[in-house]
Every structure is written in C-alpha cells, then in structure tokens.
Amino acid sequence: MKLVGSYTSPFVRKLSILLLEKGITFEFINELPYNADNGVAQFNPLGKVPVLVTEEGECWFDSPIIAEYIELMNVAPAMLPRDPLESLRVRKIEALADGIMDAGLVSVREQARPAAQQSEDELLRQREKINRSLDVLEGYLVDGTLKTDTVNLATIAIACAVGYLNFRRVAPGWCVDRPHLVKLVENLFSRESFARTEPPKA
C-alpha cells in the first residue's frame, strides 16, 4: 500500500496517522502537487493529494474517502463508532476540521502572492472561518460532544488542522480562550504517530 502526498499537507498527515495508529504498513511517496514536474496526476487526474494506492493498484482519493476506506479494512483500533448515526456525527466533525485545513491552505497561498496582489478581504474571510470553527470545536469539548482524551477520526483531524495552523503560523492566537481545545491537541501531539508525522522545519 502506498500513500501519495506531501509531508506538509495536513490532509496527508491525517491519513498517515490513521495508518500508523492501526499499524498498517505503507510506503510514503512524497509528491509536491504544485511542482510542475510532479507525478500526482498518474494517481489522481485532479492532480491533488492525498492518494492511497492499494496492493491491487486501485487509487483512492480524496482525504475523507481514503479515511473511510482505511476504516473499512477493519483493522483495530476503530476510529469510528459502530452506530451509523454516531459515526456520521464523527464524520461531521472531521469535515469541520478539514474545512479549517482548507481555510489555512487558502490563507497560505494568498500570503505567498506578491504583497500588492494579496487580498485582505480574502485573508479576513479565511480567518473568520477558522475562528468560527475553532469556537464550535471548543464548544463541543465543553458540552461533552468531544472529550480531550478521545482518539478517533474527528480528534485526529482536529489536531492535524491545528498543527497546520501552527506550522504555517496561520491564526497565531488560536489557543486564546480555548483551553479545552489546547488540552485535546496537546494529548494527541504527545502520541508517537503525531511525532513521526510532524512537518519538516522550513
């Protein structure tokens, strides 16, 4: 099994962590989708990462589909509840965390443009998306929808999203007034799977 992606992608990191937590052996193929000579399109015609390539050569994309495929392999520990509705609730929170990653990626791309071409309105929109979503996640931790000691698909996605914000210095004050969220990500960052997938220093 091969995972095609970039070491800096939070979506790729989420899937690497799922595989590591389940003890599933895989080969990592480092491809930078924004490089002109990248080989991603041979695995995904959209040219996007991550892509999971099975032993039979079947290619799975994108991130939520791959996460579901990994879970369907029925390798312990389970990262989704057995109950379909509870599982869908976890997937909803995963989608929220993935949205934070998307907003972070858009912010990074916007800030990479020449200063005169950057849109402050666009950056503000993305910051607002991130902050609203982080507030909702903090609320889930306060009301018990999420717990700080839980390891599942949703909490892994949340920690990968926050890890990306830290890595790219997007929303630098995210931890202010969100103590439960801080506790959750600290617990997850201490796990071996997170240590092994930490993005390389610039």
Swiss-Prot record:
* All copies of domain GST C-terminal, residue ranges: 83-202
Amino-acid positions noted as binding glutathione in the UniProt annotation, renumbered to this chain:
S9, V49, D62, S63
Described function: Glutathione (GSH) transferase homolog, that might be involved in selenium metabolism.
Q: Which GO terms describe its biological process?
A: glutathione metabolic process; L-phenylalanine catabolic process
Single GO MF descriptor: maleylacetoacetate isomerase activity
For this protein, the record's PROSITE patterns field holds: GST_CTER, GST_NTER
Instruction: List GO terms (cellular component aspect).
Output: cytosol
List the protein's name: Uncharacterized GST-like protein YibF
Domain GST N-terminal stretches: 1-78
**Disulfide feature:** none
Q: Which family does it belong to?
A: Belongs to the GST superfamily. HSP26 family.
Species of provenance? Escherichia coli (strain K12)
**Which PANTHER family does the record cross-reference, listed alphabetically?**
MALEYLACETOACETATE ISOMERASE
Q: Which CDD domains match?
A: GST_C_6
At the top level, the lineage of the source is: Bacteria
Q: Which Pfam family would be a valid example here?
A: GST_C
Q: Which InterPro entries match?
A: Glutathione-S-Trfase_C-like (IPR010987), Glutathione-S-Trfase_C_sf (IPR036282), Glutathione_S-Trfase_N (IPR004045), GST_C (IPR004046), Thioredoxin-like_sf (IPR036249)
